[in-house]
């Protein structure tokens, strides 16, 4: 499967979007916005990126070009930033901000970092103030350049993860992994050869990817769903060496020893440090890789079109993901594999 910038519109149409992991701050009490209402209030339209803290699940409602929050107690949905159906790239407060198909998200403190995919840049949303600023990349200018802040360029970034000191971005259109140091917003390509596809392992000058659309990080490694290559890759943080840890490189649906397992359009991934959870989109399943035993199993099957995004609760007991057929957010018990609907309530 070839997955590169030219196929991005197909990705959006099929529902293969990414979601991201985070932890942070409370949800909001904000009126529903006209144009996003159903009979019972606001709704999601093609939910993409997810981030979760102890009080809310944040959802990038991609077709609405808005960032929303689901209160974990009341299950109510509110709009945090963006104006429904109004795409753009403006920074600003709340509904004065504009996005263009926002996707993956992660939280550091009270700041939500967002892959604003079709603007090819990275945005920061301060949750208490609802203030949106562009921290890296330049809207509507795709490129491969490293540099500080808006001097750098991305090409359809999809998912983002953090270790608290840096942001790690799956720069899908460039088939590269980028790091943004939070202290100075310096952007550096740490794996992959930006603008070139391949499947090579090795250090940052040799490794190659093909449209990576999932990324997660723990204390020792960065994990990447190398979607176009149908494999899961691991980047050692200390050496920046890339290796393949799961998948044969052929489309399939096979559990077992990690390097014998097969995937079909793996998207978002997240980790608690002991297991890696993989949204295997075209197999309609959530897969679990035991990072000690190096085995892959199915955690659960999904009836609808599984969104390519996930987020773990802080205790690792619940895995959140989106369903782009039902425009819903689902919850999987990571022990039993049982699935319930978080939003819409009663879904």
Question: Where are the model-predicted features located?
Answer:
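Bacterial N-terminal signal peptides that target proteins for export
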Residues: 2-14
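Bacterial N-terminal signal peptides
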Residues: 12-22
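Gly/Pro-rich loop segments of beta-rich domains
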Residues: 30-48, 74-101, 131-156, 186-211, ...
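Beta-strand-rich domains and repeat architectures in extracellular enzymes and scaffolds
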Residues: 39-65
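Hydrophobic core register within WD40 beta-propeller blades
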Residues: 50, 105, 160, 215, ...
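Short coil/turn segments that connect the beta-strands within blades of beta-propeller domains
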Residues: 54-55, 109-110, 164-165, 219-220, ...
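Conserved beta-strand positions in repeat-built beta-propeller and related beta-rich domains
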Residues: 59-63, 114-118, 169-173, 224-228, ...
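A short loop-to-beta-strand structural motif that recurs across blades of beta-propeller domains
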Residues: 65-69, 120-124, 131, 175-179, ...
